[in-house]
Amino acid sequence: MERGSLLKAKAGGKLHGGNHGIAPEEVVAAQRARMSVGMIEAAAQKGYAAVTVADVLERAGVSRMTFYQHFANKEACFLAAYDMAVEIVMTRIGAALAAESPALERIDGALDAYFSTLAQEPEVAKVFLVEVYAAGTAVLQRRLATQAGFVDAFAGALGASLPDQRVVAEAVIGAVVALATNRIVAGDFGALPGLREPLMSALITKLVRQDPAGS
C-alpha cells in the first residue's frame, strides 16, 4: 500500500464552485472530509496547539465561512479529524477480528493491521496516538471510548468475559498502544510492524502457562 494512501482517499478530489450535478449532501460530506484531512495533516506537521483555522483552510481548499458552517471551532474540527483517524485504523482491525479463523490468528491479524496501518499512515498515527492528548477534554473522552472498544474486541476474540480477564485484556492493549506511541513520537514508523511478532510470542506464552494442556 502506498504511504498515506488511505488518508489521501478520504480527501477525495478538490471541489470547485458551482453545482456540477453533485447532490448538496455529497458536497457537504466532501467539504467536511477535506477539512478533517486538512486538520490531520496540519496537526501532524505542526502539532495541534500550533494549528490555526487558516492552516486547515489552506489544505482543504475551502473558505472560512464554509469552515464555520461545519465546525464551531478548531477543537470541533479536530474531533472530526480524530474520528476519521479512528475509522482508518479500526476498520482494518475490525476486519481482521471478524475473520473466520482461530482466536490467536485473529489477534495476530488485528495486531498486524494496527501496526502496519500506523506505519503506512504516519499523519494519521500522530493524530490517533499523540496529538489527541493536546486537543481538550472532549477529544480525550473520545479516545478513552475508542480504546475501550479495542479492549472489548480483543477480549471478545479470546472469549475473556470475566472482570479479571478483561483487566488482562486492558493491560495488553495498553502495552500495545504505549509501544506504538513511543515509536511514533521517536519518528521510527518503520519499527512499528516489527512489534507484532514479539507481542504475539509473549501472548502465546502467557496462554500456554495458563493452559498447560494447550486446549
Name what the model sees in each region.
Residues 30-41, 45, 59, 76-96, ...:
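Alpha-helical structural segments
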Residues 93-96, 100, 128-132, 183-187:
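Secondary-structure edge/capping motif, primarily at the C-terminal ends of alpha-helices
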Residues 42-76:
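Helix-turn-helix
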Residues 118-137, 181:
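Amphipathic alpha-helical segments used for helix-helix packing
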Residues 1-30, 158, 211-215:
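N-terminal intrinsically disordered/low-complexity leader segments
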Residues 136-171, 178, 193-201:
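Amphipathic alpha-helical packing segments from all-alpha helical-bundle domains
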Residues 52, 126-129, 192, 215:
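Short, hydrophobic secondary-structure boundary micro-motifs
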Residues 117, 173-190, 202-214:
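Amphipathic C-terminal alpha-helical segment
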